[in-house]
Amino acid sequence: MPRKSKKNAVQKLSRGGVVVETSAGPIQFGIPPETIKDTMTSKSGVPGTFVALDPLFNHERGISFCELEFPIYFNFYVMRRKIRVVCSKSTKQRVVTFIKEAAFGPEKINLISEYIGGMGNRAMPDLHKEMSFFRRNPFKGGERTQLSDMVTFSLFDKDGAVELPGDISIRYEKATQGYRVFDNGVQVAEVAEKLELPANRKTKTKEANSKRRKRPFYPPLFGVTVIGSGHGFDPTADTSGFVLWINHRGIIVDPPVDSTKWLADREVTRKHVNALILTHCHADHDAGTLQKLFEEQKIPIYTSRTIMDSFVRKASAITGLSQSRVRSLIDYHPITMGPPIRIN
């Protein structure tokens, strides 16, 4: 009989997910947004092995359980190693789709409709050339970085088992609906199949109570509310995002995850913020934008067609919804570079 799991071998992350300590290094089960901020400050550090749990997306909270973009960058550029993703065969293609989109960008780009005058506009960048430059592998003499340089996969077999380097194995137990982790033949942990998300962590109860207003919030004629000022690798600060107030109406820009709850705790309701600007496609802001699609009815989103198309492809792979279904959740307003855009 295998030895019982060690309690100190399992670490629950504050943002969701579980890390299991093994002799071959930590293994993370479930990867909700920003969990790298938990592991960067942990004793064991950022894992190099990640188990993608099914389903990949929580529709109730609108949160991905497989946010691998920042762990990939940290492992590749800082640790100089590729990550290992453990998943089912059916899940692998979805993971490959959104990782390639996130790491390398769109395969095809057409900026003509995004610039006045099309190809005749001198301001139009050579985006293909820029992408090729940044895709150079700094550890291989500048040759083109491939997905295999960043990620390798280990797939569960038909019995729900997988063998990993270092004599580590993971077995799915249907009876208990969980995963057992073995280190050199000894069971060191058991992880539930269903990932538990912690209560919304944007605002703690004590802080929320202290922020309660004596009178209802009234949006300013002009102003800015900063939701966060940190970046995706800053464990001490919330990811950047803000609300721009114009004529008593709010426009949320690059919303981080759980931004709606953060605002609600300050009595800023959904009716106050009725438009969204997405400036880029990193996962820390994809997470908040995707979440808003599942929290409320269609919200107008203003961004370029290139950014929107990339967002839709990633969202489709993460949620399992078709691209047409994802688009149906969005009130999209394309932006053309140069002329002013009227919002609200």
Stretch-by-stretch model annotation:
Residues 23-26, 164-177, 217-224, 247-248, ...:
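Beta-strand-turn-beta hairpins that frame and shape the catalytic cleft
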Residues 253:
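Active-site flanking residues adjacent to catalytic metal/cofactor-binding acidic residues
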Residues 37-87, 95, 249, 257-309, ...:
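Active-site metal-binding motif and surrounding structural segment of the metallo-beta-lactamase
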Residues 128-173, 180, 196, 305-344:
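Metallo-beta-lactamase
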Residues 1-175:
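Long, compositionally biased, glycine/small-hydrophobic-enriched stretches that function as flexible linkers
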Residues 172-192:
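Low-complexity, highly charged intrinsically disordered N-terminal segments
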Residues 187-245:
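Eukaryote-specific, low-hydrophobicity, charge-rich regions
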Residues 16-21, 179-180, 240-244:
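Short beta-strand scaffold segments in enzyme catalytic cores
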